[in-house]
Amino acid sequence: ICGAENNPNSLSCTNCGAPLTAGGAQPFNPFFNAGEAGNPFLYGVTIDPESEIDGAKVKDIACTVQSASARYIPKFKAMADDKKKITFNWAAFFFSPYWLFFRKLWKAGLIFMGLMLAVALPLTSKVEALTTAYQAYSEAIYTSSQADITAAFQNVATAMVPVLPMLGIQLVLHTIVGFIANPLYKRSVVAKVKKLRAEYPDDRAFEAATMRKGGTSILLAFTGYIGYYIVYNLLLYLVEMLIK
């Protein structure tokens, strides 16, 4: 594929890493793209791998982003060229702060988690009051008079009033994250590429470093998910103890 000569007994190309058949023939490699053989993260990327985005080469960004690089690199390029200053990340909108941890934006993830906790704690008692009022209303439908049903429904409406603004705040927070996610991720990736390139000028060493420090982390996302509920319940317990 890359044109390099290999030992007939080699199982893979010593230059690009492509698998070799027993006869030494080099089968078609779908990841081969514009001279960047052996880089699967460039698959689907239509931008020149040697071109730059804010001073970082596209091929290096692909190695650092890894998962879904074909989706993010065009967004990064458009933002860098001022073709599309405003973008929206639906995954970040629905799944933050866990998306932030998944993409190794752990500092932003911690900040967003703190904001969500600040909203969730006072919201808990309001939701509990709304749940209690709704349960009473549901029971009244089958067991009480029309007057009692009307009174129970009014209690539900009253309990819902303080919940709506807090839900609105949560929606605003998620919307903000949706808008800042792609620019934040681009800045993080470009900074990481430049830092790793300075430390590892050799391509092989750089690629090995990005496998460790780039990409995504399901473990970090899961840890963030568990950590959120541990901190939430701990703070809720402390608040209840202070009230008592």
Predicted regions span which residues?
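Cys/His-rich metal-coordination motifs, chiefly Zn-binding "fingers/knuckles"
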Residues: 1-32
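Helix-coil boundary and N-terminal low-complexity module in membrane systems
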Residues: 3-5, 30, 41-43, 85, ...
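Internal amphipathic alpha-helical segments of the cytochrome P450 catalytic fold
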Residues: 10-13, 107-108, 182, 186
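Glycine-rich, often proline-containing surface loops adjacent to acidic residues and nearby aromatics
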Residues: 12, 91-95, 163, 168
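Transmembrane helix recognition focused on a "late"/terminal membrane span
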Residues: 27-76, 81, 116-244
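Membrane interfacial helix-start motif at the N-side
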Residues: 71-108
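Hydrophobic alpha-helical membrane segments of integral membrane proteins
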Residues: 109-114
